[in-house]
Amino acid sequence: MSSKVIDKIMSFLGIEEEEEEIQTPQPVVSYDRRPKVVNIHTNPQIKVLISKPEKFEQVLSICNELKSKKPVIVDLQKMDKSEAQRVVDFLSGAVYALNGEITKISGYIFLVAPENFDVTGDIKEEVNALYNLN
């Protein structure tokens, strides 16, 4: 009983015995400490397709490749002049709509490139130097 009286007096004076808190162990979460390494110098392999359409209807497959962000070299030498002009007109419209670029390499050979493909320099001179086209 005396301990209860002493506890009450100590409580009244603001002096209390601290109760020990029982701490339960928390599970430890482990993280993978290995750094995530990404090679920023990887160059994606760019494939340039070569198309030699013989009919105007084949221009759609060229446009599909262009929509898939693939550059295409179009060789129109096997087509008659009016049909080749229709193909170039159609490709020019597609290139404009897709923010791409069309470049004449030589007579009836064109490079049709999507917007993610940068064409720089005088490509005609470079191709002529490589293949002796005149």
UniProtKB/Swiss-Prot annotation:
- Cellular component terms, GO, for this chain's entry? cytoplasm
Q: Which UniProt keywords apply?
A: Cell cycle, Cell division, Cytoplasm, Septation
- Among the Pfam families in the record, one is SepF
Entry-linked Gene3D superfamilies: SepF-like protein
Regarding protein family, the annotation reads: Belongs to the SepF family.
**What does the record note on quaternary structure?**
Homodimer. Interacts with FtsZ.
> Could you tell me what this protein is called?
Cell division protein SepF
Instruction: Tell me which species this is from.
Output: Caldanaerobacter subterraneus subsp. tengcongensis (strain DSM 15242 / JCM 11007 / NBRC 100824 / MB4)
Its ancestry begins with: Bacteria, Bacillati, Bacillota, Clostridia, Thermoanaerobacterales
What gene name is given for the protein in this entry?
sepF
